[in-house]
Amino acid sequence: MKKHLAFVAVVFSTLVGPVLAHAQLIEKTALTLDGAKKIAAVAEAKAKAEGARVVIAVVDEGGSLLLLERLDDTQVASVNVGIDKARTAAIYRRPSKVFEDQVKNGRVSALALHGAVALQGGVPVIFDGKVIGAIGVSGETPSQDEDIAMAGAAVAATFTK
């Protein structure tokens, strides 16, 4: 019996010990509502300067909506498209244009990726080399949507912890 308990103790410490020695939690930097407002404000200023009628959606790292703006006279359909572009950029940690380019190049399997929208205009928000959220813009041409989104995302370089 003692040998059996000793054996179990050795196996337990060998297999479980290293797992317990590692941290079970990590610290993450999260995008705040204030940060989302700053991102949207820059994007909105660029859109208005260009006379663009767009929806601006800002999501957190997991793709949950933090802020949504629909500029005056923007088509209603752009609301969901803008959110989907932002979510795509957040959960896949790359611009939504990547998926659009894949489809254009014949890789239609990109359309089957869960939660991915193959439309240009979603851009990750990066702070300290990590994706902390994303911005999606919809309502104008694909390249104009992306330019507005990139302007908003760029403000993250000024953020502080």
Regions found by a protein language model. Give the residues of each.
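Flexible, solvent-exposed loop/hinge segments and secondary-structure transition points
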Residues: 22-161
